[in-house]
Amino acid sequence: RGSWDVQHHTQSGGTAIFTNYDGGAAGENGSSLIQLEANAGIRGITLAQLNIASDGFSVDNPRKTPFLIQGQGPKVYIVNVTIAVGDKGIDLASYDTSGHYVDYLGGVPLRAGIWVGGGAEGGFIRNMQLNPHYGSRLPEGGQGYPAVFMMRFVQSNCSALKFADVKNQTIFNNFVYGSVYGIHFLKDAITGKYPGEMTVIGHGSDGCTYSLFVEDADKNTKIIAINSELVNTKIPNEPVRSYVLMGDKVNTDKVHPDAKLILYNSAFWGSPVFGAIINNGIVSFQQANFSRSGTQGVDVRGGKAHVFTSYFAQKIVEGTNGSEGYARLGIQGKSIEFTNNYYISGFRFNKSGEGLIYGSDKK
């Protein structure tokens, strides 16, 4: 236990562990610096990987290391911990850590934030924030912390939050700034199972390439996101960006056609290339605010979409010849339903193939 009883920033100082540990001969596949057995935990402390960008490594090519913290049994806890800089944050995916509790984590992990799976049940991930400025806003005089500016790197290399085989997981009031994937759902590498039913409340992804990504899902997957704020920013080396990505390619067999992603009360803004890319499964939006919708707001390349009581605020210039719209149903897309929505430039959509566009908005 360290000196902090509240969430804290690198610049606030306090109890810290400075490390040059890089996994030894095993490198990033080595043991974690801190290993938490059942019922063990860490709180009130700051961690800093001093050699992340030294000795032949740099901010463009930082050192690869194991996760700083690994849970190895049930009811582990990580509370009021800050990662000033590190390659990987918290591993709750390699073991069953049922009942894990993560609260008020902050920091800048470069390649991995918090990864959760392993069949864990009843865990909590809440009130955490990942942001590159934890690596550059230091205490008075520096106090030995490495000064690193990692914005561009994390935007192209980090997977901040990963959820795989978990049950009854509480995912509440979390925020990620700068990541390839802000929040990411995928098949479990340990159990081989897919994400089941889970609810995400108050999640924010900003400065991300894909703010929410469902990579793997079976017929029983049902992810509900409530009060999300999903944001893209212009990232020079990321030519495709979207708030939502359902499946990694058109009609991918990694996402079952009956897998469901449901978003309620969502705020979408920034600089997307496409608002939502749907490659398979069923995605539903209810009360979404598309402040910017990109070239195509809801781009159904495979699978289905439903859009209810939502607002499309981006103006579409006359004479775009179908290159822009609030929706596109691709050749292999099955259907899009549009009901009770408002479009600042009127309902504009593009359609290829035999799929169906329907709902009260289609006159």
Report the location of each language-model feature.
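Detector for repetitive beta-architecture
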Residues: S3, L33, N39-G44, K75, ...
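Extracellular beta-strand-rich solenoid/capping regions of secreted or surface-exposed proteins
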Residues: R1-G44, A48-V76, K88-Y95, V116
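C-terminal/domain-terminus segments
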Residues: N61-K64, S179-H203
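Extracellular and organelle-lumenal recognition/adhesion modules and their flexible linkers in secreted
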Residues: D248-P257, I262
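Leucine-rich solenoid repeat scaffolds
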Residues: R292, G297-V298, K304-K363
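A structural detector for beta-sheet-dominated domains
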Residues: N20, Q35-E37, A48-A53, Q70-Q72, ...
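Short glycine/acidic-rich loop motifs that flank beta-strands on beta-rich extracellular proteins
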Residues: H9-T10, D22-S31, N51-V59, G86-A93, ...
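Short, solvent-exposed loop/turn segments that connect beta-strands within catalytic domains
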Residues: H9-T10, I190-P195, N220, D253-H256
